[in-house]
Amino acid sequence: DHGNKQIKTVHCSPFVSGLQQSITKPFGQSLQYRGNYYTLSNERIPFRKDKTEDDRFFVLTLIAIAEELEARQIGKQELYNIQLPVGLPPAHFGAQAKKFTDYFKRDGIVEFVYRDKPYAIRITDVVCYPQAYAAAATMLHTLMDDPKAVVLDIGGFTADYLLLKNGKADLTSCDSLENGVILLYNKIRSRGNSELDLLLDESDVDAILAGRKTSYPAEAVRLVERLAQEFVNDLFSTLRERMLDLRYSKVVFVGGGAILLRRQIEASGKVGTPLFVTNINANAAGFEYLYRLETAGR
């Protein structure tokens, strides 16, 4: 799951979609590929709708593959054959799916070194699925009797919505809104600095919204929670302008932003029946689930 904020696989902990590149081996853990060294960075790659413009998301994918092989405890092999289900926002799916799958279809064997361990992989298959739909895939059978339901994936830079009719995706009623939680982080950082002379980073905001104990004063907590509630209310108002009234339908919330903002979503009073997919890796798990269904008869 190639998020603008994080890369996620089925079994690994998410990591930030950020890379530092150098021609000499850096201190610490790194990946070596095509004569360059790469280390993970907390500084995200700037938002881009087209992630195929350079090799950075491919390098992040190599790291994800190595981490997933390790997590699955797959023993050392001379060559790993990799099947790679990936995803795109529903609104970009039709226009970008072929280009995105072609980006990962590298000819022949790809060799790299990660954490001082050599890997040789062959990507034998790449299939692309709509995000949001994939995250909700395992629960779609529970929505087959509902004439209308909405899947809302609140991510880093975007909030993707998709209408379901009797459990089936309606790709004519979907879009990707630039209403991700990074917009909220930036607003909180700016207001915290101007109003309270505080420097709040994303981990501070996450801790406050998760209800964890912090050393920040009560007015900082109130500011964060108020702006988070405004963010959620504004998002729902935007959806209503697009003729999606969430008060009278089931809404499946997925994505790290939805998990983070669950209290605000439930407090908004603007959602009839909210259903939460609490696995932050849900899109990645959904891609694998849909891929296994699709290839079961091969």
Annotate each predicted stretch with a short phrase.
Residues H2-A149, K168-I182, S203-R298:
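Nucleotide/phosphate-binding catalytic cleft detector across ATP-hydrolyzing
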Residues N186, S190-N193:
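Long, charge-rich alpha-helical interaction segments
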Residues Y161-N166:
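PRPP/pyrophosphate-binding module of the type I phosphoribosyltransferase fold
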Residues L196-L200:
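Short, basic interhelical loop/turn and adjoining N-cap
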